[in-house]
Each structure stands twice: as C-alpha cells, then as structure tokens.
Amino acid sequence: MEVAEPSSPTEEEEEEEEHSAEPRPHTRSNPEGAEDRAVAAQASVGSHSEGEGEAASADDGSPSTSGAGPKSWQVPPPAPEVQIRTPRVNCPEKVIICLDLSEEMSLPKLESFNGSKTNALNISQKMIEMFVRTKHKIDKSHEFALVVVNDDTAWLSGLTSDPRELCSCLYDLETASCSTFNLEGLFSLIQQKTEFPVTENVQTIPPPYVVRTILVYSRPPCQPQFSLTEPMKKMFQCPYFFFDLVYIHNGAEEKEEEMSWKDMFAFMGSLDTKGTSYKYEVALAGPALELHNCMVKLLAHPLQRPCQSHASYSLLEEEDEATEVEATV
C-alpha cells in the first residue's frame, strides 16, 4: 500500500496562504514613494513645511467630493501636499497687500487703545503702513503694491520699494456696499501684474525674489466667485508664492442653515496646497490690538518661517523653566 507524502499538501497550502496574503490594501507605509510620484507630476510644486507628508499622501487620489451630502458651500477638493525643501534665505519679497473696502470695514466696533470705538478700515490702514515701513527697514529691496477690493478689484499702487509711494494711496479710501466677492478676479489681476520666479533647482538655488499676497478681508460669509483654473492652480503650486490672510469677522454664530464665518475661513485655508501660508481670524468686536498682533506675525520672511502650526511667539516654552533658562552670549 502506498502512503501519500504529508509534505505535498502542506506545501500547496503554504503556497495558497502566500498567494492569498499578497493583495494588501494600500497603506501610508511609503510616503516617500508617494511624494516622488507627486513630484514627477508636479515638478514646480514646493514646500518647506515639515511633518505633514503622511497626511498628504493619505489624501492623494481622492479629489472627488461627490460622496458628501448636498451643501451650498462649495469648498475646493484638497490637493495633495508635496514636500520640497526650499533654501531658507532672506531674498527680496514682492508683497501685494489686498485691502477689502466693504461697508463692514467702516463699522465702529473695534476697541482702540484708549477704550473708544473705531472701525477696521482705520486700524488696517495704520497696521499696513507700520508693516510696510518695518519691512523696508529690514530689507530696502522689498517691494510693495496695494490692491483694493469691493465689487471689483483695483490695482492702486504698483510694486515699489518706496513705502511713501504706497502710503500716499492708502488713506484716501471709502467703503461701499458689496454684493459679491470676486476672488477669481483678484487672483487673475495678480497673475497679470506679477511674474513668478523659476529656478533650475528648487531645493538648492535661492530664488531672486518671492511673491506674497496679504488679504485683509471683512465680509459676511458668502460663497466667493471662484473657480480654480489651470493657471491659478500653477500659481498656488509655485514654491515662491504665498497667500496670507487676515479675516475680520463678526464673531457671531450663525444659524445652522446659514453660512458661518468659519466656513469662509476654512475655504480660504483650503486654497493653500503647500501648507506654507499664514491665516488669522479676528473678531470685529474685539480689541484692535489683535489686528496689530496678526500683522506683526506676518513680518517674518515666508522662506524662513515655519509652518503656522509650528510657530511659537513666546520666549519660553514652559513658565516653569523661567528660572532655569539663562541668556548666553
């Protein structure tokens, strides 16, 4: 009588187990590979922010928002973030300051330093002048432009390295009732007036300059007129373009069926696909000092500052360490 060898079925079972274990779900175990594929598709995309590679690769390949329920607020689908380190150099900046002239900017709700009420336009004009003059003292090669936004967008002051030239256009402004916010028109104007630098190697060669847009915005929540065109997408993906925001909102919680200022703030934040922009929100009925503090934090050079979530403005991380830390020269 012949007896079958016990090893034969065991080997077949092992092979079946190996084959059944091969198809595994996609994981985040290789974020570097995912980033390499993204870099090949978008060679000009860049970011010097850190600690966000895995989260970015997890979102890759899911641009569709059809699974979400019907909602009137349309937020652009999140784009995959690509981590490319840029040289942390203090190269010249071309700063385009965009000032909202909606009627909300003229409401006397902010608390000034002496306790009286003032409006956001008055405080914004002062903090913009202080910002421009301070940046000019840091580096006289910085250039500044002023754009005002109501129903339309107007380029008041061209790029100049003379702060007096911009400040001469800053104070003769009037607010108006605005029905819409043409965000697409604003970015299209910036693209027409500005040339974005290109380098042979983003990671090692410093750019001749960087372009930064600072939007001071104050309106009730409303869906902006905006569609992400291909030229606009390239602008946001450019490693030398930065979009900073100071959003002055009413601070009130709207009803559930209405749009909230938080929705608008999230919408503006979703435009930054590199994680390099800074965004601040200030209540319209709060102290004016908060607006000044936001503008002071924007003085840092975009290539030298960390991502906003890592930024710290305290001298000491822990109050308990105050007695242990000594200044050394």
Curated annotation (Swiss-Prot):
Span list, region Disordered: 1-86
Assigned keywords, A-Z: Acetylation, Cell cycle, Cell division, Chromatin regulator, Cytoplasm, DNA damage, DNA repair, Mitosis, Nucleus, Phosphoprotein, Ubl conjugation pathway
Subcellular location: Cytoplasm; Nucleus
Feature: compositional bias, Acidic residues: 10-19
Family matches, as CDD domains: vWA_BABAM1
Residue ranges, annotated region (VWFA-like): 95-298
Job description of the protein: Component of the BRCA1-A complex, a complex that specifically recognizes 'Lys-63'-linked ubiquitinated histones H2A and H2AX at DNA lesions sites, leading to target the BRCA1-BARD1 heterodimer to sites of DNA damage at double-strand breaks (DSBs). The BRCA1-A complex also possesses deubiquitinase activity that specifically removes 'Lys-63'-linked ubiquitin on histones H2A and H2AX. In the BRCA1-A complex, it is required for the complex integrity and its localization at DSBs.
Protein name (Swiss-Prot/TrEMBL): BRISC and BRCA1-A complex member 1
